[in-house]
UniProtKB/Swiss-Prot annotation:
It comes from Xenopus tropicalis (Western clawed frog). The 9aaTAD motif is a transactivation domain present in a large number of yeast and animal transcription factors. One of its GO terms (molecular function) is DNA binding. SUPFAM superfamilies: HMG-box (SSF47095). Residues 235-245 have a biased composition (Pro residues). This is Transcription factor Sox-1.
Length: 401
């Protein structure tokens, strides 16, 4: 025990000069390092200073952390009598420190805290959040994973009625909320195409209005009269409804074949799909009493959608699609599944229901004439209609080809 006391007594004079020199250097400099005045050593530091040097010499390969562990364990087992001289030395160093630095105040060193990473929301969530501010979220069809071009076709709104532009798109929400969960990666690719696509379609649907699309309807109007008027003369011609029904069949085509190639069908010229809607609404009003309920439902849907803007009609018409689509799948002797780009076939699919009720022979003749006209017109269809038609073959087989 005396040997340890002698060692500490020998080392204790050496403890003071480093602390004094460091303190005087810090006090005389009056520089930035004056803020870093070291704290006075406590009893353990006074004792462990000499012991650390001795243990490092005995075990040169031992790490400093291991030395600290052993010194701490050894200090704990020491008695009060053994610690007394080191405690006294620490008191003397503290008094000296207070004398040299009367205004010293311990300021703990600020530890650089690692910044917590912000939660990265997915792009879909970001798009849905943006939809709350009046922007549009993007929902992709099952075939939309191949690229961004296919995803833009079935754009939808997640939060209807929010923001300035959300009022026009509010009714599109009923089309693909739970049916088509889009992948986030493809949604990111589709977000770039979204703005230009939306601007073009909105401009085509709002600015031309009812007057802009009807000039495209009339060139097809004479073609329907030879096929329909001989069989459906008792039903009068009501005025064509507002331009909302023109999107009935492009949305139904998307519903049955949501493929990337259908984007060109969605964004085709107004003469392409404008005539489809007019012919479909016209044939419904010209139909026999069996299709009168369908026409009434379509008219009610169009009237309900008229108050929500030009684009608001898309969702409401899609919601009424189940009442229109059953004749498509109904297999009769004269029924043929429609090609989305063929005007004649969409007309002829309503002919058998009206013709068989009145004159079956006349209905068969009209269906044959419509089939001949359809096959002759298939070769002159635009490329995007053919692409959409080939996509439909997976669900509705084309028997006339």
């Amino acid at each position: 025990m005396y040997s340890m006391m002698m060692e500490t007594d020998l080392h204790s004079p050496g403890v003071q000069p480093p602390s004094n020199t460091g303190q005087t250097g810090g006090g005389g400099g009056n520089k930035a390092n004056q803020d870093r005045v070291k704290r006075p050593m406590n009893a353990f530091m006074v004792w462990s200073r000499g012991q650390r040097r001795k243990m490092a010499q005995e075990n040169p390969k031992m790490h400093n952390s291991e030395i600290s562990k052993r010194l701490g364990a050894e200090w704990k087992v020491m008695s009060e009598a053994e610690k007394r001289p080191f405690i006294d030395e620490a008191k003397r160093l503290r008094a000296l420190h207070m004398k040299e630095h009367p205004d010293y105040k311990y300021r703990p060193r600020r530890k650089t805290k690692t910044l917590l990473k912000k939660d990265k929301y997915s792009l879909a969530g970001g798009l849905l959040h943006a939809a709350g501010g009046g922007h549009m979220g993007v929902g992709l069809s099952p075939g939309g994973g191949g690229g961004g071009t296919g995803g833009v076709v079935v754009q939808r709104l997640e939060s209807p009625g929010s923001g300035a532009s959300a009022g026009g798109y509010a009714h599109m929400n009923g089309w693909a909320n739970g049916a088509y969960p889009g992948s986030v990666a493809a949604a990111a690719a589709a977000a770039m195409m979204q703005e230009a696509q939306l601007a073009y379609s909105q401009q085509q649907q709002q600015h031309p209005g009812s007057g802009g699309h009807h000039p495209h309807h009339h060139p097809h109007h004479p073609h329907h009269h030879p096929h329909h008027h001989p069989h459906h003369n008792p039903t009068p011609h009501p005025p064509p409804p507002p331009p909302q029904p023109m999107h009935r069949y492009d949305m139904s085509a998307l519903q049955y074949s949501p493929l990337p190639g259908a984007q060109t069908y969605m964004t085709a010229s107004p003469s392409g799909y404008g005539a489809l809607g007019y012919s479909s609404s016209q044939q419904q009003h010209q139909g026999s009493p069996s299709s009168a309920a369908v026409a009434a439902a379509a008219a009610a849907a169009a009237a309900a959608a008229a108050s929500s803007g030009a684009l608001g009609a898309l969702g409401s018409l899609v919601k009424s699609e189940p009442s229109v689509s059953p004749p498509v799948s109904g297999g009769g002797p004269h029924n043929r599944p429609p090609c989305p780009g063929d005007l004649r076939e969409m007309i002829s699919m309503y002919l058998p229901s009206g013709g068989e009720a009145g004159d079956p022979a006349a209905a068969a003749a009209a269906a044959a004439a419509a089939a001949a006209a359809a096959t002759s017109r298939l070769h002159s269809l635009p490329q995007h209609y053919q692409g959409a038609g080939t996509g439909v073959t997976g669900t509705v087989p084309l028997t006339h080809i």
